[in-house]
Amino acid sequence: MKFKTALLLLILIIFVSCKKDSFASIKIKIEFENKLNQDLSKIYGIQVYKDGKIVKKFGAFEKPYIQKEITLDSLANGSYKIVYENLINQTLQKTVQIEENKFYEVSIFADYSDYRTLISKSFVRNLEENHKVEFYFESVGCFHSAKESLIISKKGKKYYVESNGKSRNLNRKELDAIIKLECELDLIKYGGCTTSDHYIVKSGNEQKEFYDETCKWNGWNNLLKLLNLKKTKV
């Protein structure tokens, strides 16, 4: 009887000790809003901070490499910030507050951008009936060149896209994607790529001009895929 009691006591001590020394874990899931473009190689770096100090780094070109799912084990209580750059080189972050020893899960979207504050200034968003917004695109690289255009117009409550002389109406998802592209052009930061994408957006007497040298965003080609339009090469 004494032996059984002692054994149960020993098991209880071990259990309490293990529970006391256990730590939390965070699983970072990398996802994409655009299911047509899920290239992990376009995410160059992820940094994890605890209470303001960096504790882990992941990269596209050096170990430990960025993977679709990243698990951080043996984490003590505290505030953890997951910092990364999206496809237009905006620095974004997610915060996980660890207060107990359990499994935490957080998703980061590599192609998410904080563009919604710019929607009110969008030419397409403010398009009036029987007017048009013109998009001109030119891409030049070491081994390619391309020159294309889209015209967005409005008749009644319907929006239309014209490409290569053909026109059709746009659904809500397609219209939102065009507005998103226009807004994200305003957010694109530094580049450094040998490929330069030049955008001009015109509405009446107003015109906006942008250059994308990120080699990550690929906004024009992604939009053409969504609209089911073919690329033109020159």
Predicted regions: what they are:
Residues M1-E31:
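Bacterial Sec-dependent N-terminal signal peptides
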Residues F32-Y44, D114-K166, G191-E206, V234:
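N-terminal domain-start interaction segment
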Residues G45-E62:
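Short amphipathic beta-strand segments in non-cytosolic proteins
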Residues Y49-K53, A76, E99-F103, S153-K157, ...:
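Short, solvent-exposed coil/turn segments at beta-strand boundaries
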Residues K63-S74:
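Short, surface-exposed beta-strand/beta-hairpin micro-motifs centered on an aromatic residue
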Residues A76-I88:
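A short, solvent-exposed beta-strand micro-motif common in secreted/extracellular proteins
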Residues K94-E134, K173, D186-I188, T195-V234:
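Short, well-ordered, aromatic-rich surface patches in folded extracellular/luminal domains
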Residues K158-Y190:
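Mature extracytoplasmic domains of secretory-pathway proteins
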